[in-house]
């Protein structure tokens, strides 16, 4: 038996080193090398090689026939949109997200839909027993005979079962709990994650079985394990949201078969995850029309316009240093906006505590929402109500000018569906609008001062 030895792997790029170093010599990242004890290398039952087999031969590109097999629909329109029309046969997909955000719930519901409409699905869990999976399935009202579950962490055994079943979809929950006996290291280590992912990649490509693997995330929000993991897979998805709120967003970070600009929006309810085809209506359902400090903004989630209410509260500070608090909005942008309002508009905010909140637990970082945020702040400061059928859009510069924003007509069309009639937009965008709809009123502004006069006149 080979003597055990200690090696160090970079969690970012997977580089192997015989000694610890503060900085990875390959990728240059700091404090990414972790120690692993290698007791000896066993003879691998499955050679570690690339996709395909040793008999593969090169083929001219025009001679390659495109398979007639269509994408597999999950029957969730929100998920199919993010994936570019459905699951591509033979694709290896990675789903990441914070603990408890709903990753397993989402994939269990997808497994049920695929099992009912396409064929057998194998759900392999290394985190829950079969009894625990059954209890979760009952809560979600899932009871498909074609959905088979296995509670195991031995990837080789799971792949043997998948070979026998030939499922239409394979789910691995999660890659950090899986191990192969050919690598003498703990599950979740860099070498185990890399080798297990490599074997899953070969399996799904050679047998044309789409596979989804769940990945844990670090406290920085990155997928745990080597960065190579994200490079190996075909699709990288992130499931985001605040656990204390019901809304969840499925975002594509990498997609070899479609766009990365699409997003899917869900609501977490008692029966599981429910897709929201019209999230703007849900976000504005409880908006009050009798209170100051409220405005409606339209931000782009990928290429999808979403209307959301923003609220502000401005009170006289009880301390020497005024507080600025932002929930769902960038604090630095808020501080800049307050400085612009004080310098360019003459509002006294140096002795005021300012609190802003984006309703629904969503996070908005788009500059196009600057003007609506500024209007909400002034609304509460002056105790003036913003018209309920008005939407304000525009990026605010340090000089107080209102700059153009992208996809203005797409945003306006989305707001029209919900009954909004008045729009204040940048002058540069106003000149670009081609649709002269007489049922709505659009005004273009050049400065933040002009916008305030239009809203509160």
List PLM regions with ranges.
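Conserved RecA-like ASCE P-loop NTPase motor core of nucleic-acid helicases/translocases
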Residues: 121-125
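Peripheral, non-AAA+ core regions of ATP-driven protein-machinery
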Residues: 2-12, 16-81, 88-94, 101-112, ...
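Divalent metal-dependent catalytic cores for phosphoryl transfer on phosphate-bearing substrates
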Residues: 130
């Amino acid at each position: 038996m080979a003597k055990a030895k200690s090696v160090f792997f970079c969690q970012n790029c997977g580089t192997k080193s015989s000694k610890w170093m503060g900085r990875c010599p390959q990728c240059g990242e700091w404090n990414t090398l972790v120690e692993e004890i290698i007791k000896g290398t066993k003879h691998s039952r499955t050679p570690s090689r690339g996709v395909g087999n040793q008999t593969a031969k090169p083929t001219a590109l025009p001679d390659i026939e495109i398979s007639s097999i269509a994408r597999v629909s999950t029957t969730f329109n929100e998920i199919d949109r993010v994936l570019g029309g459905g699951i591509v046969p033979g694709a290896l997909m990675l789903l990441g997200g914070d603990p408890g955000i709903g990753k397993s719930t989402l994939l269990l519901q997808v497994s049920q839909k695929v099992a009912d409409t396409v064929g057998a699905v194998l759900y392999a869990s290394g985190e829950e027993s079969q009894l625990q999976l059954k209890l979760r399935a009952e809560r979600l009202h899932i009871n498909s005979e074609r959905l088979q579950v296995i509670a195991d962490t031995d990837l080789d055994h799971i792949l043997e079962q998948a070979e026998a079943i030939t499922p239409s979809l394979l789910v691995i929950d999660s890659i950090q709990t899986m191990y192969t006996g050919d690598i003498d290291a703990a599950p979740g280590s860099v070498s185990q994650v890399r080798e297990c992912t490599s074997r899953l990649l070969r399996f799904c490509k050679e047998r044309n079985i789409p596979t989804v693997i769940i990945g844990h995330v670090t406290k920085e929000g990155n997928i745990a394990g080597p960065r190579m993991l994200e490079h190996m897979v075909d699709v990288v998805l992130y499931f985001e949201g605040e656990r204390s709120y019901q809304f969840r967003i499925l975002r594509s970070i990498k997609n070899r078969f479609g766009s990365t600009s699409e997003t899917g929006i869900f609501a977490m309810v008692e029966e599981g995850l429910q897709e929201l085809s019209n999230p703007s209506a849900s976000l504005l359902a409880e908006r009050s029309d009798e209170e100051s400090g409220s405005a409606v903004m339209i931000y782009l989630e990928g290429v999808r316009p979403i209307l959301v209410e923003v609220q502000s509260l401005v009170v006289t500070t009880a301390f020497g240093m005024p507080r600025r608090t932002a929930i769902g909005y960038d604090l630095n942008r808020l501080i800049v906006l307050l400085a612009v309002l004080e310098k360019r508009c003459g509002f006294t905010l140096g002795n005021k505590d300012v609190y802003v909140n984006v309703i629904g637990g969503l996070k908005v970082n788009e500059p196009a929402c600057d003007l609506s945020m500024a209007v909400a702040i002034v609304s509460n400061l002056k105790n003036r109500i913003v018209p309920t059928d008005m939407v304000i859009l525009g990026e605010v510069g340090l000089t107080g000018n209102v700059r153009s924003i992208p996809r203005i007509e797409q945003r306006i069309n989305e707001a029209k569906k919900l009954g909004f009639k008045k729009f204040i937009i940048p002058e540069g965008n106003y000149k670009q609008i081609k649709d002269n709809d007489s049922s709505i009123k659009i005004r273009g502004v050049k400065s933040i001062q002009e916008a305030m006069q239009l809203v509160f006149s």
